[in-house]
Curated annotation (Swiss-Prot):
The active site is at H60, D103, S104. It comes from Legionella pneumophila serogroup 1 (strain 2300/99 Alcoy). The lineage of its organism: Bacteria, Pseudomonadati, Pseudomonadota, Gammaproteobacteria, Legionellales. It catalyses: a lipid A + a 1,2-diacyl-sn-glycero-3-phosphocholine = a hepta-acyl lipid A + a 2-acyl-sn-glycero-3-phosphocholine; a lipid IVA + a 1,2-diacyl-sn-glycero-3-phosphocholine = a lipid IVB + a 2-acyl-sn-glycero-3-phosphocholine; a lipid IIA + a 1,2-diacyl-sn-glycero-3-phosphocholine = a lipid IIB + a 2-acyl-sn-glycero-3-phosphocholine. HAMAP family: PagP_transferase. This is Lipid A acyltransferase PagP.
Amino acid sequence: MKRLISCLTIICALNASAAAETTSNPCSRWISFLKPVCQRIHQTWAEGHDDMYFSGYAWHNRYVYSNEKIKSYNETAWGGGLGKSLFDEKGNWHGLYAIAFLDSHRHLEPAVGYAYLKTASVNKDLKAGLGYSVLVTSRVDYDNVPIPGALPWAALFYKRITIAATYIPGSSREGHENGNVLYMLGKISL
């Protein structure tokens, strides 16, 4: 519950910060080479559609984990969250999100981040995208310390519905297995 409140506090702080900035030059205090990053994040927040995220599956790589270990893991990573997203002038997707889900040990794991996908249109309603996400998360097994990360991300967009996946790399060292998880999530643009 504390982590959920922390995520909501971060979202509210970002919203208050965005509202406090002047609309004419919201990134004026950023270092010059980071201004494009600020401007894209601000554009996504200000012009993006509201999104509702849901998750439900985390596949643990069968080539890394034993059957016994897999049976002990939670692969139904139920959770959800909120976000903002938009397709830019080139048709590529940008998203800001805050989600929480049940991790492999059935503990609540929050994450907030930004994602970018280079997209290709299959037809008018269907797009495919490949890109990355940069995020901050925290886990019980790491004493709930905020952990920054970057992950690959792929998605299929159909009208307002999106199915996305990321692969969390890890170690397969005997007795120290972690990561190596395909995490699936969905999104509905409201």
